[in-house]
């Protein structure tokens, strides 16, 4: 009867290409086979998981029923330097998934600062969920959207912003500002251009003739233009 090999054995992935796309990898297992030999090991992963290790990754290899003709790779070994720094925490309250190119999904269960972070390792795009709200960052162009409890802010990398609050909308671009709040539209800029067909309107209020002596606050922009 052939020897049976039970338990886990250290292996190294030498080729992760699989024509059938079933997660089979060629591994070397020096403690069982000659060092130059590679054997096809089937994937033994949790249901719904589809992660194939890169070449030269250290993996754990087992054999179905102890039979060396039926190897399985059942997990990866974390050698020094391979652990995601985002998950290097004690106690281990952070769970992370990281791909070879640096794409990262981090679940932080630290009490009081629970959060989820999704990062594009190539372009530095980020989507973060925290107790304060949700933040989306464009890592390539520098734009940003932040949704908090009291406001939503859209920020262009050049400095222009739009802020949405429960009863106000504010837009800023350089020195120009527009604010809509409590039925009032406030425009602050060195030049204000009105669209075609519009005309400057000066509204003094609804005071009657008998109230003409009352003071009426008036704000006049000397740089208002009407576009015909």
Regions found by a protein language model. Give the residues of each.
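Short coil-to-beta-strand transition motifs
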Residues: 2-10
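Asp/Glu-centered strand-loop micro-motifs enriched in Gly/Pro and often flanked by an aromatic residue
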Residues: 1-2, 43-48, 226
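Short, small-residue-rich loop/turn micro-motifs
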Residues: 29-33
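Beta-strand/loop nucleic-acid-binding surfaces
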Residues: 34-50
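Short aromatic-glycine-enriched beta-strand elements
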Residues: 20-27
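Right-handed beta-helix
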Residues: 10, 17, 51-57, 63-228
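Conserved strand-loop elements at the edges of beta-sheets that form or border functional pockets
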Residues: 7, 43, 99
């Amino acid at each position: 009867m052939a020897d049976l090999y039970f338990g886990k054995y250290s292996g190294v992935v030498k080729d992760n290409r699989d024509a059938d796309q079933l997660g089979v990898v060629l591994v070397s297992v020096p403690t069982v086979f000659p060092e130059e030999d590679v054997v096809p090991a089937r994937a033994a992963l949790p249901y719904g998981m589809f992660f194939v290790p890169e070449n030269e990754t250290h993996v754990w290899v087992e054999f179905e029923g102890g039979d060396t003709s039926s190897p399985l790779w059942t997990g990866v070994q974390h050698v020094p330097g391979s652990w995601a720094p985002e998950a290097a925490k004690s106690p281990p309250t952070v769970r992370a998934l990281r791909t070879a190119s640096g794409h990262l999904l981090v679940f932080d269960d630290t009490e009081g600062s629970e959060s989820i972070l999704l990062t594009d390792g190539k372009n530095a795009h980020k989507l973060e969920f925290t107790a304060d709200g949700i933040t989306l960052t464009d890592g390539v162009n520098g734009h940003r959207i932040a949704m908090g409890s009291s406001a939503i802010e859209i920020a262009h990398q050049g400095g222009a912003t739009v802020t949405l609050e429960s009863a106000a909308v504010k837009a800023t671009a350089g020195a120009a500002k527009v604010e809509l709040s409590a039925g009032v539209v406030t425009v602050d800029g060195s030049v204000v251009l009105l669209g075609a067909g519009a005309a400057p309107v000066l509204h003094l209020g609804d005071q009657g003739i008998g109230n003409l002596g009352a003071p009426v606050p008036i704000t006049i922009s000397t740089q208002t233009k009407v576009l015909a």
